[in-house]
Amino acid sequence: MNRKGTGFSLSVSIIMGAFLAAGTAIAKDPDPSRLLISRNAEFNKEILRVSDNVYTAVGYAVSPVSMIVGPQGIVIVDAGLDVASSREIRADFRRIVDKPVKAIIFTHGHPDHTHGASAFMDSTDVQVWAREGFPHEQHALETAGILIQKKRGKKQAGFALSPKHRINNGIAKAFWPSRKGGIFSADHKVNPTHIFNSERQKLSVAGLDLELVAATGETDDGLYIWFPAEHVVFAGDNFYKSWPNLYALRGTPYRDIRGWANVIGMIMQEDAVALVGGHTRPIIGKREVNQTLANYRDAILFLFDKTVEGINKGMTPNQLVDYVVLPEKYKNLDYLRPYYGNPEWAIRAIFSGYLGWFDGNATNLFPLSDAQEAQRIVKLAGSEDALADLIVGAINEKDYQWAAMLCDYLLVVDPKNKTVMLRKADALTALAQDKLTTTARNYYLSSAIELRKQASALASE
């Protein structure tokens, strides 16, 4: 293995478990921005040696890319966000070992794990493995003709924001698309050449024996990879160091939350000594891996079971988010902090995923339209001017959620009210600063930018 003259950071010895262990409980920090800034250390750009023959590149793009070295070549696990960053990873992998890529394995079909694949196509004989249904999420929405998730996805990711307003993305550095073709555009799309449709598929390639395991969690096409010779598991997006994204703001089909927790239990049964997640740094050491996965699984199951308990008591989604409170032992674990996903969204997703839109309150069988409700709120306030005064009062009292809601009423009855647009933008900006969940921050701030642009356009008419 040639490590001379490399321009990248390589941990030449196996990562110490104490360094990467994610099981450290930390005190609750009232300053989300400070927590996110300290989080940046998780995304330092380097190649980590996970075991004797496993290397993981972190910090190059949104998701890690791993290399398993075999006697006859290498296997790539996930291919990164884009061809440019993946080419850099390929070059740095080649400095470690100059062997041909024999296979690429996609843990699921999200673009940040697949769109860099052409950088690893050393020949036309490279096997590209994925699970049946790949990529399920995109197919389900596109088949229905639903496109709005693309616009919402840009807000969730914060692509319209400046570096000043994106500290990171919770589970990755803040990246922006390098091409105008769309979110996570691929220069050369690489499709799977091999699909497996069983619960567990044994794969012999490059002189390596691997096992691909069906693992429906974040996506229906998800899988994890078990490398028994070195007891390494590659979990894909079913694990990363954050409260999991059990519901994505861009809009997705229901993610089987109980099934997700069960997959974590399956991964635990492998008894791995190293865990490579779909984002963030690997976890090394049997004890650390088992403890982390157990807490991850148990926290998800607690939330699911408590939500079902509340549902069976007749609670509405709004009532459930007050009823379901995670125990402190989970809330204070850094790898369960809501950097990316948020427990409240998961609670609402469970309700709608099983019971649909109707919350059980007869009043809501045929609710007022937005216009009808807004007109009545204005009447209740006394006038549009009186409602505008209430908005100012709410902002002055730092009641930003209420201020934004009041703005919505007034914008329904007066959709070109520039002043209210700007006040809602201010309220959303303030809400963003108070949230740790990066996807929420991004969505708030992106929406605020839209409102300010709309107000500016109206002012110039």
Model-derived regions, located:
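Metallo-beta-lactamase
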Residues: 28-34, 49, 73-75, 81-83, 137-214, 259-271, ...
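Conserved beta-strand hairpin/beta-sheet module of binuclear metal-dependent hydrolase folds
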Residues: 44-97, 224-227, 231-237
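Active-site metal-binding motif and surrounding structural segment of the metallo-beta-lactamase
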Residues: 42, 71-73, 84-130, 197
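Bacterial N-terminal signal peptides that target proteins for export
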Residues: 1-13
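Divalent metal-coordination and catalytic microenvironments
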Residues: 53, 68, 78, 93, ...
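Accessory terminal helices/loops
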Residues: 28-37, 146-150, 160-164, 175-177, ...
